[in-house]
Amino acid sequence: MAYPFQLGLQDATSPIMEELTNFHDHTLMIVFLISSLVLYIISLMLTTKLTHTSTMDAQEVETIWTILPAVILILIALPSLRILYMMDEINNPALTVKTMGHQWYWSYEYTDYEDLCFDSYMIPTNDLKPGELRLLEVDNRVVLPMELPIRMLISSEDVLHSWAVPSLGLKTDAIPGRLNQATVTSNRPGLFYGQCSEICGSNHSFMPIVLEMVPLKHFENWSASMI
């Protein structure tokens, strides 16, 4: 999860987030090289006589500054499209969970089980226990099995919301009357926090999301106790 004065991204918990982190580093390297080259040329122009005021035509230069940006854009677009298709692909999900956004809480329904559904509200600051996180803890966590593909169906009962868990690389809009899909896969157990990421009213900041990823055996015990 995030911590104060953090400079980088949160630790990746899913294969998708690992790919997004690698793509971020890849793109940042390209931006850094371009920025360094531009600053170097500007510094040469200011400190030397590297100017050609009499040049009227330079076909070679124009060819280079046309082809080179196109190649750079291709180097950015190809991995981006690959990740985009990976995020939309899901085969044989082990579990399907329907998520509904409300003003201002989330409700969850495990569609593979009968009567396994609940609302998830933020715990007020005055009710927090020692060690719990302010504005991030909820009364009912979403318990899911780790290392299995899980399909999240996301929608809204009222206004636009957005279901986002950064460490899993997830951010999916919850739109009234529309059902969006996301894939959740966790490589390790633990608690993973997120929040509504679409301004949805006065209590928008009080819609946390908590996923508790556990081994399959623990999930089966939990689901049996909830039914």
From Swiss-Prot:
Its EC number is 7.1.1.9. Coiled coil: none annotated. Keywords: Copper, Electron transport, Magnesium, Membrane, Metal-binding, Mitochondrion, Mitochondrion inner membrane, Respiratory chain, Translocase, Transmembrane, Transmembrane helix, Transport. It comes from Berylmys bowersi. It is an enzyme of class 7 (translocase). The keyword DNA repair does not apply. The gene is MT-CO2. The keyword Zinc does not apply. It is a multi-pass membrane protein. This is Cytochrome c oxidase subunit 2.
